[in-house]
UniProtKB/Swiss-Prot annotation:
This is Probable asparagine synthetase [glutamine-hydrolyzing]. GO terms for biological process: L-asparagine biosynthetic process. One of its GO terms (molecular function) is asparagine synthase (glutamine-hydrolyzing) activity. It holds the Pfam family Asn_synthase. Residues 213-530 form the Asparagine synthetase domain. Residues 2-189 form the Glutamine amidotransferase type-2 domain. The keyword Zinc does not apply. It comes from Acanthamoeba polyphaga mimivirus (APMV). The lineage of its organism: Viruses, Varidnaviria, Bamfordvirae, Nucleocytoviricota, Megaviricetes.
Length: 550
């Protein structure tokens, strides 16, 4: 991970360099290895580009950003560009370093910004200053693996972009996430009056869709009769390649192993590619949790010797929740429940090992439609529409959790299940083949594609929510939180809470909201709604799958 930040100061005012650097410092967690910045003058506009580095590819100073080209254009990027060598060869680009992000400026000069976006096989968030044409561009990868926020301060004539909310919160009136399927263009030749008004904002920010999410109206007639064996071969090949391309780094790579199907498959594939002696796994949970037991079985089956089990308990979790919410920048219930043990695990990795790059199984449940509530989807069309919605909103929930818990501890996470080629293939499979049926388990076609990779009882282990599975039979993590919040809040206090937007309906939600508000007051809109299951007859207020009547 790295941290990026950009400020644009209008009106001929001198940019507040001290304030810019203070905001940049708030991203040091994402990039603890180095910090750098560039101030760019463009007439009466001043641009600040800042970068905090976690050195992964080319750990020398040659990989330190911002990058600058002969046209005095600049780029900053938080990302991993997996096809940068292929692009350099294809377009005859001479690289000055081995840093993958160096490819952006020469590629931009050859292909333009939309062409650049279409060429990248990457997880990224980037800002490019085209000084020659007086344009600024900002975008993130199409599934939102890497974060990017924008904001503005009308009174000061200031616009900003940053990797995290915390870097903009103190200086911006308004902050919002850049949507993963959009890029932002700012015309630097336009000179708005200060303070900004709404008309200025509309002229300044141009949002363009560069990726359309998958069709939501597909029906059975859109699909040819499938050859199941060929489908499984393709699934195996594409996921293997997704893992393979994410194993390249100039730092040692580790693996987050929950013990569930998704992370276990990633570890099993990597073991076949690298050999068991080169695999280091990390698991977290209560002693006696089903996840920890399953993870132990996986590493034993694969012959992996280096397996760290990070202890977790109610007290450890409760003591960390304030830091967790400040780090992950949300008040969503299920995100915080799952983030807490993951944050504890990330902290352990950072403090006790030299590993700084990790592979994880995030994104699988969304694209495969394997959440428990998806069993209630009335038909294949509604099932498919819901997987699209989940994919579109990943940046609000699970991607935010995984990015922040890892980056908050100076680590980088890579997610093979969100590989572009793999997602494209899965989203074009007949949804009937992914839907849960009474006679077989969810994701059966995926499981069958990897027979022999894992013990049968792990390969066909039913899904459990991460925050549930880290618990033990005796002690449940989220129910322990709810017990505490029952003691903190009365029914009357819950009913009369001052939060109008996304009003907390349970005491646990109010507890999280109060903590969030203490750090990011006035930013309630940063998530449009809570993550909750669909297709339920009754109004569901708790996201845990354990309470669903299925």
């Amino acid at each position: 991970m790295c941290g990026i930040i950009c400020f644009i100061q209008y009106g001929g005012q001198k940019i507040d360099l001290v304030s810019c650097l203070n905001c940049l410092d708030k991203l040091n967690n994402r990039g603890p290895d180095a910090q750098s910045y560039q101030v760019i003058e463009l007439g009466d506009i001043t641009i600040f580009l800042g970068f905090t580095r976690l050195a992964i590819m080319d750990t020398s100073e040659a990989g330190l950003q911002p990058f600058k080209d002969n046209n005095s254009n600049y780029s900053i990027c938080n990302g991993e560009i997996y096809n940068y060598k292929n692009l350099a060869e294809k377009f005859n680009i001479e690289m000055q370093s081995q840093c993958d992000c160096e490819i952006l400026l020469p590629l931009f000069n050859l292909r333009g910004f939309e062409g650049l976006l279409s060429d990248l096989d990457a997880e990224f968030a980037t800002v490019i200053v085209d000084k020659y044409n007086s344009k600024l561009y900002a975008a993130r990868d199409k599934y939102g693996v890497r974060p990017l926020y924008y904001g503005y301060n009308c009174e000061k004539g200031l616009i900003g972009f940053a990797s995290e909310l915390k870097a903009l919160h103190s200086v911006m009136e308004y902050v919002e996430q850049v949507k993963p399927n959009q890029y932002v263009t700012i015309d630097l030749s336009f000179r708005p009056s200060i303070p900004f008004d709404l008309q200025n904002f509309v002229k300044l920010f141009q949002f363009t869709n560069y990726h359309e999410y998958y069709q939501s109206h597909k029906s059975l007639i859109d699909y040819h009769e499938p050859n199941i064996e060929q489908l499984q071969t393709s699934i195996n090949h594409l996921l293997t390649e997704a893992v393979r391309k994410r194993l390249y780094a100039d730092r040692q790579i580790g693996f987050l192993l929950s013990g569930g199907l998704d992370s276990s498959l990633i570890v099993a594939i990597a073991t076949r590619l690298l050999g068991p002696t080169n695999i280091v796994c990390f698991s977290v949970g209560f002693e006696g949790s089903p996840d920890v037991a399953a993870a132990r079985e996986v590493v034993k089956f694969l012959g992996i010797k280096n397996h760290h089990i990070v202890p977790f308990s109610v007290d450890i979790g409760l003591n960390a929740i304030n830091d967790v919410i400040k780090t992950i920048e949300t008040y969503d219930i299920t995100t915080i429940r799952a983030s807490t043990p993951q944050f504890i695990m990330a902290k352990y990795i950072q403090e006790n090992t030299d590993i700084r790059v990790l592979l994880s199984g995030e994104g699988s449940d969304e694209i495969h439609g394997s959440y428990k509530y998806m069993r209630s989807a009335p038909n294949s069309q509604e099932f498919h529409k819901e997987t699209i919605r989940l994919l579109e909103e990943l940046y609000l929930f699970d991607n935010k959790r995984t990015d922040r818990t890892m980056a908050g501890n100076g680590l980088e996470v890579r997610v093979p299940f969100l590989d572009f080629n793999y997602v494209d293939f899965i989203m074009n499979i007949d949804p009937n083949l992914l839907m849960y049926k009474s006679d077989y388990i969810e994701k059966k076609i995926i499981r069958d594609a990897f027979k022999g990779y894992l013990p049968e009882n792990i390969l066909y282990r039913p899904k459990e929510a991460f925050s549930d599975a880290v618990s033990s039979k005796e002690i449940n993590w989220y129910r322990s939180i709810q017990k505490i919040t029952e003691e903190i809040y009365t029914d009357e206090k819950l009913q009369n809470s001052n939060y109008k937007f996304n009003k907390p309906e349970i005491k646990e939600a109010l507890y999280y909201r109060d903590i969030f508000n203490s750090h990011y007051g006035g930013r309630d809109h940063i998530i449009p709604h809570y993550w909750l299951p669909r297709f339920q007859q009754n109004n569901v207020l708790d996201p845990s799958a354990t309470i669903l009547p299925i």
